[in-house]
Amino acid sequence: AAGSLKPKEVRIPGVLVDYIVIAPEQTQTTQTQYEPAISGEISRPLSAFRYMEHGPARVIAQRVAQELQSGDAVNIGFGISANVPRILLEQGRHGDVTWLLEQGAIGGVPLLEFQFGCASNAEAFLPSPQQFTYFQGGGFDLTLMSFLQIGADGSVNVSHLPARPHVTAGCGGFIDITSHAKRIIFS
């Protein structure tokens, strides 16, 4: 109803709304019906997060973790990079760095697989466009990126998959983030 919100609290003006759809079956993520730690309502105990299994991906993630310095603001991408926070957690280094996700989470413990892009126990959430403004300003220390292929000349393929059904995955925020990163670590 008109006047029910203060003007600065309005996110979508009524003139732009034709319908409101209530979807009670809407999930929070593709694999999560609802998890209050993702929305910041509760804090999930650090002991509840699973660690990486032993194998090549773990060795790579451990090596990447050695490059991180206390106080770093670090963007992470999908793939092996997404496991680095678990390595720090296991090493008792949780909180040494601040994780920055494209989707807007700052801090906390970034989640994995189809929950990637979310974080439990985040310190803050920014709208994704504001997070990208921060990335474009170069205010972060480094980014941990995954890739599909890297050529001998240093060219990086992040979006073209060789087989169907996934002919292209899309570059996501790769270009914006890597163009403004002080350091880039591929894993």
Enumerate the predicted regions with their spans:
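N-terminal active-site beta-alpha-beta segment that forms phosphate/nucleotide-binding
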Residues: 43-124, 128
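Conserved phosphate- and dinucleotide-binding cores of soluble alpha/beta proteins
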Residues: 1-45, 113-187
